[in-house]
């Protein structure tokens, strides 16, 4: 009986925080690790060179043994709206086309610089690279790893290629996205803006703000102010009032405008780091210390 060939997929995430690599065999994840676990460079954005090596060593395979490589971002979409005024930012997305292949060539046995000849030969051939739309990758990660055969899917983050929120349906082995919200309306940017306003690093320290939100503090007054800056829309999604947010204006040093700061009559209404630390200590003492 002829044994069917297994399907080996190398998954990659890089260019954003927490560069990661993983291996799936016949649709089941068998290995995965963030780059920071190996290099101790916390939340690194560098290409996950060491993570890829770890995963390949774990299954005792070479890169050439993989059937394909998947990257959770499709940089081709960013070429559609190229803006030369902000080329430093725009080309970052497009460069995925080159950085993935360029970095992975280090794993293939070759005699530099004969990369083109190697690519054309049957031996030591680079596996095909698939660039998956970012929010579709999020949806697949949620649905295909769930126990459901059919489910409604909602994905939200700062941004994908242009999408910030997606609504869809997953059924069996297919996902259909039927509604999206695009920049500048973004829940991720909304949360990052308040993270920065509180004195933390946007795109990095949101988890700290999320943890602090669980503290037993009356935030009713702040909640009413926040609701002035974000509105629900008739399609079940939302819109940000752009007079408060400027995260998509790339030459501005802050994500928020003066109008958002002035929404708070006193700047002291925004908890200082000292106040937050005291809240943390009190929460720990009251709930965990004995």
Where are the regions that the model predicts?
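Short acidic/glycine-rich loops and adjacent helix/strand connectors
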Residues: 2-290
């Amino acid at each position: 009986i002829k044994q069917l060939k297994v399907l080996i997929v190398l998954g990659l995430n890089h260019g954003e925080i927490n560069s990661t690599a993983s291996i799936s065999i016949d649709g089941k994840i068998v290995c995965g690790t963030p780059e920071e676990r190996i290099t101790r460079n916390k939340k690194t954005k560098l290409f996950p060179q060491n993570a890829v090596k770890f995963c390949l060593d774990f299954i005792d395979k070479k890169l050439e043994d993989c059937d394909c490589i998947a990257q959770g971002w499709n940089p081709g979409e960013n070429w559609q709206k190229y803006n030369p005024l902000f080329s430093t930012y725009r080309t970052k997305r497009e460069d995925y086309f080159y950085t993935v292949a360029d970095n992975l060539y280090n794993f293939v046995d070759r005699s530099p610089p004969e990369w083109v000849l190697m690519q054309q030969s049957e031996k030591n051939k680079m596996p095909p690279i698939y660039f998956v739309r970012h929010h579709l990758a999020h949806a697949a990660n949620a649905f295909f790893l769930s126990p459901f055969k059919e489910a409604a899917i909602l994905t939200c983050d700062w941004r994908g290629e242009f999408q910030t929120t997606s609504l869809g349906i997953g059924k069996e082995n297919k996902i259909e996205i039927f509604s999206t919200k695009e920049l500048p309306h973004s829940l991720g940017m909304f949360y990052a803006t308040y993270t920065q306003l509180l004195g933390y690093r946007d795109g990095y320290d949101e988890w700290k703000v999320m943890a602090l939100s669980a503290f037993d503090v009356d935030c009713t007054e702040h909640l009413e102010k926040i609701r002035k800056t974000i509105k629900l829309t008739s399609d079940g999604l939302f819109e940000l009032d752009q007079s408060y947010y400027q995260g998509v204006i790339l030459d501005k040093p802050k994500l928020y405008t003066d109008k958002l700061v002035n929404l708070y009559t006193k700047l002291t209404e925004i908890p200082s780091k000292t106040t937050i630390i005291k809240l943390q200590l009190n929460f720990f003492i009251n709930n965990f210390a004995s």
